[in-house]
């Protein structure tokens, strides 16, 4: 039995079934699309590509981030497979070269402990002062960007 489905087929299924499965789907879907258009009008786009940066470039904003848990880091290292290691996500402000990780701090610590000198990262460049807090909340409350290794 073939368990593979193409993205376009799954999207079509969701479009068909969601109005019955999700309360107020149509209204909420239109609101989400309008919200995206508003974000794009403000110049907010998807991050582009992945870059490798040295460990010294990264920082954690602990007014936003949770403390690193050594047990969680060990769990990542114990199961580590580089083929499924997603890049960390970080914000870069124009007044600093520091990349503030908002998703993947445990992954970053695990990579450093395993001997990596550079870490793959997707960077969001913004001067919005609360962006890393907002991004952390979005990622952790909605599951967006969650990786199986994190």
Task: Name the predicted role of every residue range.
Residues 122-150:
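Amphipathic, charge-rich alpha-helical segments that serve as recognition/docking helices
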């Amino acid at each position: 039995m073939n368990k593979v489905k193409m993205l376009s087929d799954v999207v079509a299924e969701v479009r068909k079934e969601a109005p019955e499965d999700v309360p107020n789907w149509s209204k909420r879907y239109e609101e989400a699309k309008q919200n995206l258009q508003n974000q794009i009008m403000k110049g907010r786009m998807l991050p582009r590509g992945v870059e490798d940066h040295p460990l010294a470039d990264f920082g954690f904003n602990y007014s936003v981030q949770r403390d690193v848990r050594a047990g969680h880091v060990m769990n990542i290292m114990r199961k580590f497979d580089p083929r499924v290691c997603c890049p960390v996500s970080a914000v870069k402000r124009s007044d600093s070269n520091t990349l503030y990780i908002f998703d993947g701090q445990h992954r970053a610590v695990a990579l450093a402990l395993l001997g990596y000198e550079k870490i793959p990262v997707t960077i969001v460049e913004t001067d919005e002062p609360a962006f890393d807090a907002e991004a952390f909340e979005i990622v952790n409350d909605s599951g967006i960007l969650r990786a199986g290794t994190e």
